[in-house]
Amino acid sequence: MMSGIFFTAFALQWAAIIAMALLIVGLFRQVGMLHERLGPVGALTLSGGAKVGETAPLFELPSLTGGEVRIGGTSTDGRSTLLFFLSPTCPVCKTMLPILVSMTKESRQSTRLVLASDGDEAAQMKMILREKLSDYPFVLSTDLGRAHGVGKLPYAVLLGPDGKVAAKGLINNREHVESLFEAQRTGIASIQDYMARRELAS
C-alpha cells in the first residue's frame, strides 16, 4: 500500500518537473521571438549636434596614441571617418570595440576609425592598453561630443569624405554599425527617417 502511494507521488513529482521544463523552454522561445520583433533594426539617432547632410565642425586634436587628428573637413585620402564615442566605464562600448575594429579593417581602404572620449586621461590610457587600441587615433574632447549631440553611449558618427555627416546614432551591435554605412549608401539618414518616408509613401 505504502509503496503504491510512494510510486504515485514519485511519478507526479517527475510529471511536474517535466511540465516545468517544457514551460521554461516555451518561455525562452517567446522571449527570443519578442526580442526579434522589438529589437532595433538600425542605429537610433538622437536630436542635437550636426544633422545628417550638414558639414561637421572641424576639429584638430592631439591623439593619446600619438600625433594630431583632423576630424571633419574634406578628407585628404578620400576616406570616410567613423567616429566612435566611448567610455572606460561603458560595458557595451567594450563589446563594440572588436566589432568596430574588425569592420574598419575590412573597409580600411574607404573608412578610418577614430575613437573619442572625455574625462580622466589615465583611465583612457588603461583602456587603450587593455583593449589594444594603440593603432587607432584616440582623442579626448568634451567639445567634440557636444558638437555631435552625444548624450548617450556608445554613439557613432559617420563622416563622408566631403566632411558632411552621412549617418549617426546609438549603436549596440554589428547591425547598428552596418545601418550607418547603409544610410550613407542609400541617403536615408536613420531608421526613423526610413519609417517616416514609408508612411508618406503609403
What kind of feature is each model-predicted range?
Residues Q109-M125, L133-T142:
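Thiol-based oxidoreductase modules, predominantly thioredoxin-like and allied folds used
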Residues G39-G73:
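N-terminal "domain-start" segment that seeds a small globular fold
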Residues M1-G49:
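Long, leucine- and charge-enriched amphipathic alpha-helices
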Residues M127-D162:
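Short, internal strand/loop/helix patches
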